[in-house]
Amino acid sequence: MQTWQLPEHIADVLPTNARQLESAREQLLALFRVHGYELVQPPLMEYAHSLLTHIDAGLSLKTILVTDRLSGRQLGIRADITPQVARIDAHLLSANQGINRLCYAGPVLHAQPDGLPNMREPLQAGAEMYGFADIRGDIELIDLMLKSMKIADMGKVLLSLGHIGIFRALSDAAHLDAGQSATLLALMQDKDTGSVEAQVKAWKLDGMWAKAFSLLPRLYGGREVLSDARGRLPDLSAVGGALDELQAVCDAFPDNEIHIDLSELRVDNYHTGLLYAAYAADFHDAVARGGRYDGLGGYFGRARPATGFSFDLRSFIGRLPAVERQPAVLVDAEDAEAAREAVEALREQGQCVVIDYGIGHNVSEELAGRLKKTDGVWQIVKR
């Protein structure tokens, strides 16, 4: 194996793309900040039992585990930042009984590639709200997600909505056990209506519940899906409440194209209610995903309402606006010492100054000029 080779699905980010990513990251964090979201930076590695919450068993398949040479305990390299932020809210910020608005932007590592473009080291950025159960919190996060997509230059974005609470309400009312719910959930993900119907028939479910489960995969489309669902799904308070929340989101974004799918349940196991995602042209999958995950912090000692979204900023490289390198001022190597004061003054002003050793350089072809001493004063002489 060549010494320069990297592990599969791991890649370097070279200067041109690195400038794009860092510029977008700075803009995103500035956007989050003016909306009241405070930056947190959880560690890349934690004890495995902290990262692998019992709520999301699937996370263990993504997490790389190592042994800590100091303690002998098992460590995990984070595959998702949300459980870490839930820990921070539950433990380190527990003095605040009100709302915590938190955001982040950092790398995660996956044991296996998670779909296309098959990268194992996403740059996960996101925002989360803890301590507010009202649908207005979800609407605030969706608005922030859509604004984030503008920074990423996504163009027209489709807002997709779902609600796992509807499926769970039907499962509870039909008295399905955990295994049955998991089986039916998997069939829902595949939009396999025939298999759903065959499965509920095999379980000999009451006709009302069998009909409801068979109907869910067919309830998708525009805003009109909600009125259709109200007329066809069982009259359960939890189902009605979920539809009310979906309607509130639709009303909050009258100018956005919205797609509703009541069987779209492709979520991490910790999600509990409203689900939302953003789709853009030329991307095979959602460019951002979010939803409600009430109670996730309970694993760390404080269960609270929570909602948030995240996305892989690195997957946007092909779409991010170009960021040109700043034109540089060159100073001849033999003048560098004498011009030190002038050079540092320019750098403090934000000007890139590069020492020219006479063997070429990788600075921008559009040079700002060369630093020369003229009439006893160091000045930038244009080419």
Swiss-Prot record:
GO terms for molecular function: histidine-tRNA ligase activity. Keywords: Amino-acid biosynthesis, Cytoplasm, Histidine biosynthesis. Pathway: Amino-acid biosynthesis; L-histidine biosynthesis; L-histidine from 5-phospho-alpha-D-ribose 1-diphosphate: step 1/9. GO terms for biological process: histidyl-tRNA aminoacylation; L-histidine biosynthetic process. Signal peptide: none annotated. SUPFAM superfamilies: Class II aaRS and biotin synthetases. GO terms for cellular component: cytoplasm. It comes from the Bacteria. It is found in: Cytoplasm. Required for the first step of histidine biosynthesis. May allow the feedback regulation of ATP phosphoribosyltransferase activity by histidine. Heteromultimer composed of HisG and HisZ subunits. Belongs to the class-II aminoacyl-tRNA synthetase family. HisZ subfamily. This function is generally fulfilled by the C-terminal part of HisG, which is missing in some bacteria such as this one. HAMAP family: HisZ. This is ATP phosphoribosyltransferase regulatory subunit. It comes from Neisseria gonorrhoeae (strain NCCP11945).
